[in-house]
């Protein structure tokens, strides 16, 4: 693992928006063209993507991971434990700051938040819940939030996040138990399907 000096929030944003691009949720242009200073506008690679609201509108979302650290070593994942990449994590305050500042500038209409597994599924889900609570209750953010449920986290934490988010989903890693055992031996089919059922039941 590459060790870095303390990072700025912008450096974290570059890493954790890039790490989120593999999370299925929405589409993005993928352009990296920067403004030359002679006009207006700037297409940076930081994770603004597009999704569709219930009424069919195309909306812009800040798409980030809370952390790219992970205790698992899934063979297909760029954030797997054994991959030698720069690791970092946001704090709940940093996610709130980014979301609110992007929203005030009319860059986004909402947030897409996923995460690697830091320490444990429950610990990670607690951090996500703390972030969503702060956004909704302290920052009074009423925009759209799509959050990924963390497989293996407790039912109570998943329900808590569900009350604060507009949409929840779970990454279905592989279609068969055999494939999951081969490519993601630390994960279980039961832990993936349990939050999916919970979300489906509302």
List each model region and its residues.
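Flexible, acidic/Gly-rich N-terminal and inter-domain linker regions that tether
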Residues: 1-69
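Conserved, mostly hydrophobic/aromatic
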Residues: 61, 74, 113, 170
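Short, surface-exposed acidic/glycine-rich loop or hinge patches that mediate macromolecular interfaces
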Residues: 64, 69, 118, 151-152
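Canonical Radical SAM [4Fe-4S] cluster-binding loop centered on the CxxxCxxC motif
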Residues: 64-93
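Short Fe-S-cluster ligation motifs
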Residues: 98-114
